[in-house]
Swiss-Prot record:
Belongs to the methyltransferase superfamily. Its EC number is 2.1.1.-. It comes from the Eukaryota. The lineage of its organism: Eukaryota, Fungi, Dikarya, Ascomycota, Taphrinomycotina. Keywords: Methyltransferase, Transferase. InterPro entries: Methyltransf_25, SAM-dependent_MTases_sf. The keyword Transferase applies. Probable methyltransferase. It is an enzyme of class 2 (transferase). This is Uncharacterized methyltransferase C750.03c.
Length: 145
């Protein structure tokens, strides 16, 4: 599904778990102001190296997603392609609380994660039901596409 075609991407974008950083770099090339974060220092170093010769609206930061206090209400769009389902179950609540903190009432959050209905991919990850509960508890509205 192409998020650009849906018209749901807005000016200030957070790419959560941004490795390999192609989404952040692509959106920045289209004029979006993008912050890419990843807990991996190596991933951020690679991202910075790739963009060092580019003039773009992207900043990469090595951060724990649950500690983004300075971004209160800042992001119009959050994209998570595989980060949320990779974290420990005990980190789901801090993650979704952070989502609630960094978004405003009109923000869009796009979260792609494994589902328990996809048996070929489902292993130790929790499925969409658990994700939905964590999002709901932290007042992150769910939109199914």
């Amino acid at each position: 599904m192409n998020l650009l075609q849906l018209g749901k991407l807005h000016e200030n974008v957070l790419d959560a778990g941004c490795e390999p950083n192609r989404n952040a770099r692509y959106l920045a090339s289209l004029g979006y102001k993008v912050v890419g974060i990843d807990i991996s220092e190596r991933a951020i170093s690679k991202a910075i190296d790739k963009t060092s010769s580019e003039k773009s609206n992207v900043n990469f930061n090595q951060r724990d997603f649950s500690r983004l206090n300075e971004f209160k209400g800042h992001f119009d769009t959050v994209i998570d392609i595989g980060c949320f389902h990779s974290i420990l179950n005990s980190d789901h609540e801090p993650y979704t609380a952070s989502l609630s903190h960094i978004c405003h009432s009109d923000s869009s959050v796009f979260l792609r994660a494994f589902s328990e209905t996809n048996k070929s991919r489902y292993r130790r990850w929790q499925g969409h039901k658990r994700y939905s509960l964590a999002l709901k508890r932290n007042n992150v509205k769910k939109l199914s596409l």
